[in-house]
Amino acid sequence: MDRTTIGPVAVVGIVGFGVIGQRWAAAFAHAGHTVHAYDPDPASEAAFQAASVQLTADLDALFPGVTPGPIRFFSDMGDALADVDFVQENGPEDIGLKRELLCEIERHVAADVVIASSSSALLVSDMQSACRFPARIVLGHPFNPVHLMPLVEIVGGAKTEPSALETARHLYETMGKKPVVMNREITGHLALRLMGAMWREAVALVRDGVASVEDVDRAFIYGPGPKWTLQGAFISNQLNASGMEDFLTKYGPTYQAIWDTLSDATLDAPTVAAVTASTAAAVGTRTQNQLKDERDAGLVAILQTIRQHGAL
């Protein structure tokens, strides 16, 4: 998660300056880029200013001794994007609105400027379908909280050029991010699908009364969580035997038996009620802000450890 010298991207345009866009802006600026931010909501600038001190402190803990680039705010998209080298789009998760927004961004930037969308689940092929220059549209999906989490998922659509993917990958890497370039599109991309599979089983376990939210979370935090954080699921499992083939041979039947009994989870009213009540019991008297502060402080320490000891 180290940084390298800034390449040809000097000015980054941020379109959509909500929570995701604000944290992208902080990360780009802290990596030395000039940031031009635009959002139709004038209150977004004040919201960022209120959060900026803590965002900068978080980034300083990960990357000390740097001088951040400037963040400039614009009330007009054309003015914001007039001379940018890269655009990070953070609009609503609606395919119709996303297409319109990408087409509008295109009107204000040169034909070779890569436009990366932060979309959580939409496919690039669908998003780029109405674009004039679809070859430069890519996915650049971050993980929350964006300014801290290293992962950025990159993938192109049917009309994306490989050079656009490489531009995005190089930019994110120079910021200290850990980009993964996917081989093809799929709904939910990579990490959310992995999380979704685990989350579905966790919800079912709570719904069916197998365990409480607190115990489900404890099982992960104090079980596979630390090992997976350092080495991922595959390498961690390989270490449980003399190699992956040996692991699959020895423990394959056990996992197959588990897979054969995994549950489906539908978020119907009874399930929502059960999960909500059990989560409230686990949270106790802590507020949302307290939980967020606990998370972000802990993430800094964890990410510093991964930088020193992580396998990948």
Question: What function would you assign to each model-found segment?
Answer:
Residues 1-61:
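NAD(P)+-binding Rossmann beta1-loop-alpha1 motif at the extreme N-terminus of oxidoreductases
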Residues 15, 38, 74, 90, ...:
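Structural motif
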Residues 31, 154-185, 196-226:
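Internal alpha-helical scaffold of NAD(P)-dependent oxidoreductase catalytic cores
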Residues 35, 87, 115-116, 137:
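Hydrophobic/aromatic residues located in beta-strands of well-ordered beta-sheets
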Residues 40-43, 58-114:
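Rossmann-like NAD(P)-binding element
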Residues 117-183, 188:
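Rossmann-fold dinucleotide-binding core
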